[in-house]
Amino acid sequence: MESSSSSNSYFSVGPTSPSAVVLLYSKELKKWDEFEDILEERRHVSDLKFAMKCYTPLVYKGITPCKPIDIKCSVLNSEEIHYVIKQLSKESLQSVDVLREEVSEILDEMSHKLRLGAIRFCAFTLSKVFKQIFSKVCVNEEGIQKLQRAIQEHPVVLLPSHRSYIDFLMLSFLLYNYDLPVPVIAAGMDFLGMKMVGELLRMSGAFFMRRTFGGNKLYWAVFSEYVKTMLRNGYAPVEFFLEGTRSRSAKTLTPKFGLLNIVMEPFFKREVFDTYLVPISISYDKILEETLYVYELLGVPKPKESTTGLLKARKILSENFGSIHVYFGDPVSLRSLAAGRMSRSSYNLVPRYIPQKQSEDMHAFVTEVAYKMELLQIENMVLSPWTLIVAVLLQNRPSMDFDALVEKTLWLKGLTQAFGGFLIWPDNKPAEEVVPASILLHSNIASLVKDQVILKVDSGDSEVVDGLMLQHITLLMCSAYRNQLLNIFVRPSLVAVALQMTPGFRKEDVYSCFRFLRDVFADEFIFLPGNTLKDFEEGCYLLCKSEAIQVTTKDILVTEKGNTVLEFLVGLFKPFVESYQIICKYLLSEEEDHFSEEQYLAAVRKFTSQLLDQGTSQCYDVLSSDVQKNALAACVRLGVVEKKKINNNCIFNVNEPATTKLEEMLGCKTPIGKPATAKL
């Protein structure tokens, strides 16, 4: 955390100099690119004709892409792999030939077999499926044009958000549609277990990686060299998900750095002049896996990927999932990001083929870039009216008068746009039409009955999932849609919560509380490391812009109009504050000296279910394994829980005094203090 002195620059800004804050932190209303519905043409042109069209994608610097077998040969014969094999042969006393054979086997398991025939088959099939389940697939054409130029100039890395299995299928479909090279995609080994489907994905550009490498130096060397070879040759755009896995809660997950490290290396070793990173935001009106995700969050194991499971999922073809919006962000030059920040000279001191241990500066740079890319994804995520509707309903459950819901939704629409949210309102229709249409799309969650909008939380008492009630499933499903709003609202909302938790109005005290909350919830939301002060300033600016607060030299004052805004924002984040309080109470009640993560998750679920059954809590969000895991990570980071590794297993011990202090600080029983420390 920053020291308390870091706040001085902000506290010198008073109402007499608002222009500085406006220039630095205003979120100007963007002139959003025009979206094109690509399904419109698909509905009028034969799918077979589309699949068999003349496909001549633009290529990197006009070179002829090499064949998949050539990439494998290049990796197998690379200096880096030769060096690693020699080193491992000395360490393990295995012969070079045996290790070389192992490299060949790894490549056979890993490599894609990109073939035009498979791409055409997927284009034909996906066109039919997408037309059946989606009303629109909207793409920003300006983003596509920028991507077209980027692909011809430098190697390109596509970094899409990850909310559904549809994500990577959709991107390949779109790039084929626009005559761009279909990407090579980093996919989990899970898909290889699917008969025929795994091979079809391989022939459509997927290359497969193990979830964990387990310290396997040879596997890591082969995998990284394989990715770098494709990147250096400009063979095709390389695509992977920074989040590492699909977000079950619809919040952006904290980034994983492994693949980003790999794709940056050719630039730092001067093997390519530049590399373009392209953040892509994929937004869904309705997630295909919404029910499956909630089951997983409630502790039901994720079903194994299988062809049988895929065939059973055919029933979704009879459902309507609304629209998808895909926003291709501006290509970001790695060279520009590194300019004046990172020197490449250290890579000149040793031959390129010798692996180097990553420096602290490089790790910090990769971390910063990863978070910046995710923030760009968030900035361009499209919000649907349903996210507003469900956010209002969750603060007025179980039912709400239709006219009141329309009024409150319109109010929230204005606030969302003031905060810079990318909100798509269907064809500028009146709210009286949009709200019922949204409810109809999500009829499994809510319904309109006699001018009352009702969340389906009381439709049955039967136990559905391991003793969990149907209403838990419905409410967690609602939370996932509400969470889409939190990415935009997090900074002003944390200021609002800090104002509520702070006695008095002193700006410095509010900032200390904000900093404490930001640190506690660092695993829940995406914050640029070391950016606490600017996040606070942005939150304050947006609240000033919405006329909720006034900032003086020393104080933050709530306006008469601001009470409504702050009350809503506090309500939006109340589930997270309460969830962490409940988890602290569980940790204090834990009788075991140590426990594993699996034991913790099962015990927290049982503890919170009892509170809900007794009626002593109405916080259903704490049932989510996503919240439970993030809270445990926060507790470890804050010193509330100690994490140890014994025999390759992680165990946890509770620090009771620190846990008590955290619970009291979240419950406003203990002042946050100045400065709020990184460790409790």
Curated annotation (Swiss-Prot):
E.C. no: 2.3.1.42
Motif (HXXXXD motif): 162-167
Main location: membrane
Record's keyword terms, sorted: Acetylation, Acyltransferase, Cataract, Disease variant, Dwarfism, Membrane, Peroxisome, Phosphoprotein, Rhizomelic chondrodysplasia punctata, Transferase
InterPro entries the UniProt entry points to: DHAPAT, GPAT/DHAPAT, GPAT/DHAPAT_C, GPAT/DHAPAT_LPLAT, Plipid/glycerol_acylTrfase
Motif position, Microbody targeting signal: 678-680
Pathway: Membrane lipid metabolism; glycerophospholipid metabolism
Membrane topology classification: Peripheral membrane protein
GO CC annotation terms, alphabetical: cell junction; cytosol; intracellular membrane-bounded organelle; membrane; peroxisomal matrix; peroxisomal membrane; peroxisome
A Pfam match: Acyltransferase
Compartments in which it is found: Peroxisome membrane
Domain notes for this protein: The HXXXXD motif is essential for acyltransferase activity and may constitute the binding site for the phosphate moiety of the glycerol-3-phosphate.
Subunit note: Part of a heterotrimeric complex composed of GNPAT, AGPS and a modified form of GNPAT.
Purpose of the protein: Dihydroxyacetonephosphate acyltransferase catalyzing the first step in the biosynthesis of plasmalogens, a subset of phospholipids that differ from other glycerolipids by having an alkyl chain attached through a vinyl ether linkage at the sn-1 position of the glycerol backbone, and which unique physical properties have an impact on various aspects of cell signaling and membrane biology.
Family, similarity comment: Belongs to the GPAT/DAPAT family.
Involvement in disease: Rhizomelic chondrodysplasia punctata 2: A form of rhizomelic chondrodysplasia punctata, a disease characterized by severely disturbed endochondral bone formation, rhizomelic shortening of femur and humerus, vertebral disorders, dwarfism, cataract, cutaneous lesions, facial dysmorphism, and severe intellectual disability with spasticity.
Protein name, as recorded: Dihydroxyacetone phosphate acyltransferase
Native source species: Homo sapiens
